[in-house]
C-alpha cells in the first residue's frame, strides 16, 4: 500500500496548475480547463509547456523508482506507477480534479518497460489513423493497456497494472469522445 500512496502523492502534484498560477493563469478555467501539459503549452507557451511535460513524465518515472525502492520489489514499482496516474487524474490539491494523466502515464510505462510505451505509441498511431480522432485513439489505448501489459509481463500483476493505469486515462478522456 505504501508504494501506491507515495506514487499517488507524487502524481497528485499539479505542476501545470502551479506553472499557470506563476503566470497569472488558472488552467482549470482557461483554455481546455485541463491542468495538463497540452493546456499549459497552449496558454503559457512552448517553453513552460515543455517543462510541464517533462516534469509530469518525471513524476511517473520517479513514482515507479520510489515504489520499487521502498518495497524492494518490482511489484512495488508497478503499484507506485499506478498511484502516480491516479494521483494526477484525481489530485487532492485540485479538489480531485486533475489532468488526463498521459504524461505521467507515459513516464510510468517508460520506467516499467520502454517496450510498453512503444507499443502504446504504435497502437495510438494506428487508432488515430483509423478513427481520425486522437481522443478516441487515446481511449482505445487506455482500454487496451491491461492486455498490452499482460502480454509484456505475462502475470496477473501486470494485467492489474495495465488496468490501474488505463482506467483513469480512459475516464479522463471519455468526455472528449466527440472531439
Task: For every predicted segment, state its role.
Residues 117-119, 134-142, 152-166:
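Loop-to-transmembrane alpha-helix initiation sites
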Residues 16-21, 87-97, 124-131, 170-179:
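C-terminal ends of transmembrane helices
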Residues 41-44, 67-70, 87, 102-131, ...:
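Interfacial segments of multi-pass membrane proteins
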Residues 9-27, 51, 130-136:
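Alpha-helical transmembrane segments within multi-pass membrane transporters and channels
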Residues 3, 7, 12, 16, ...:
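Alpha-helical transmembrane segments in multi-pass membrane proteins
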Residues 36, 40-44, 49-50, 54-63, ...:
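Helix-loop-helix junctions within the multi-pass membrane cores of secondary transporters/permeases
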Residues 26-36, 93-106, 133-140, 144:
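Short, non-helical or kinked segments that cap or interrupt transmembrane helices
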Residues 18-49, 98, 178-179:
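Cytosolic, membrane-interface loops and tails of multi-pass inner-membrane proteins
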Amino acid at each position: 500500500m505504501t508504494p501506491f500512496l507515495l506514487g499517488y502523492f507524487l502524481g497528485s502534484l499539479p505542476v501545470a496548475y502551479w506553472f499557470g498560477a506563476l503566470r497569472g493563469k488558472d488552467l482549470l478555467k482557461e483554455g481546455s480547463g485541463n491542468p495538463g501539459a497540452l493546456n499549459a503549452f497552449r496558454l503559457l507557451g512552448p517553453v513552460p509547456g515543455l517543462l510541464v511535460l517533462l516534469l509530469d513524465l518525471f513524476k511517473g518515472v520517479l513514482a515507479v523508482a520510489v515504489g520499487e525502492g521502498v518495497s524492494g520489489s518490482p511489484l512495488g514499482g508497478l503499484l507506485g506507477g499506478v498511484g502516480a496516474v491516479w494521483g494526477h487524474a484525481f489530485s487532492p490539491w485540485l479538489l480531485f480534479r486533475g489532468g488526463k494523466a498521459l504524461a505521467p502515464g507515459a513516464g510510468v510505462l517508460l520506467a516499467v518497460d520502454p517496450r510498453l510505451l512503444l507499443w502504446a505509441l504504435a497502437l495510438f498511431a494506428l487508432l488515430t489513423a483509423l478513427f481520425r480522432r486522437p481522443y478516441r485513439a487515446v481511449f482505445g489505448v487506455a482500454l487496451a493497456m491491461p492486455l498490452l501489459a499482460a502480454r509484456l509481463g505475462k502475470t496477473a500483476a501486470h494485467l492489474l497494472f495495465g488496468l490501474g493505469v488505463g482506467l483513469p486515462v480512459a475516464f479522463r478522456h471519455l468526455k472528449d469522445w466527440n472531439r
